[in-house]
Amino acid sequence: MTALIFDCDGVLADTERYGHLPAFNATFEQFGLKTRWSEEEYGEKLKIGGGKERMASLFDDPAFAREVTGDRSELVATWHKTKTAIFKQLVADGKLPPRPGIPRIIGEALERGWTVAVASTSAESSVRAVLSHAVGDATAARIPVFAGDIVPAKKPDPAIYQLTVDRLGLEKADTLVIEDSRNGLLAAAGAGLRCLVTVNGYTKDEDFAEAVLVVSELGDPGRPPIEVLANRGAARPGPYLVLDDLRACLEGGTVENGGGR
């Protein structure tokens, strides 16, 4: 049976620019911290896997470390809890619509009997909120979510994808990961899985040499045609991706050349 594993942030919705970044900055303000990340600075922080880890990186600045005292683990945990609540409110307020093609592809995949899952090292409650907003509560209830600190290491470590495959009993040869970043791609490839990448503003210039297909978005009927940035598989995309394109991404190739088998 074919399986699709979706990353959350930047894949289900454009959460980084319009959700996580403002939530981080609102948290910093709420706790009286002077830090405010610009879009460019946050783009650099995205190279660090995990929200708590990004917050912890503030202490790499000696001036910040001198000003902010206390147990760093406790501080970061408190900040991150607040940031997660702010982020979830942004989702509830409708600030983060799904990326094109997400509701359509997920709905059609479930109708065809494919397994659909979400694997992310973001906070589980945030991931579930984004998923429910993207596809609706009824559809989201049919989709297993593996997220948060369920694994000890963040992407690019492959642990989250290996766990998802093991828990669901998936065949790697029949499983396609949909990611948006190089860290996510490396995590998928490290787990021996083929990966389709839908880029976003933060990741469009990253190296996706291991991806079987790289596109601007999944696309939808009535929208401008998608841009195919790289195609190392058997898919022959039209103006938007369909399930047959995703299935074709699993045909032939190896992990090293963008395949996955």
Region locations from a protein language model:
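A structural preference for short, pocket-lining loop segments at secondary-structure junctions
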Residues: W114-T115, S120
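A general structural motif
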Residues: M1, G113, K172-D174
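N-terminal helical cap/lid subdomain that shapes the substrate entry/recognition surface
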Residues: T2-P100, G107, E111-R112
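Asp-based, Mg2+/Mn2+-dependent phosphohydrolase catalytic module
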Residues: G107, A123-R261
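Residue-level signature of catalytic and energy-coupling elements of molecular machines
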Residues: F24, S120, A188
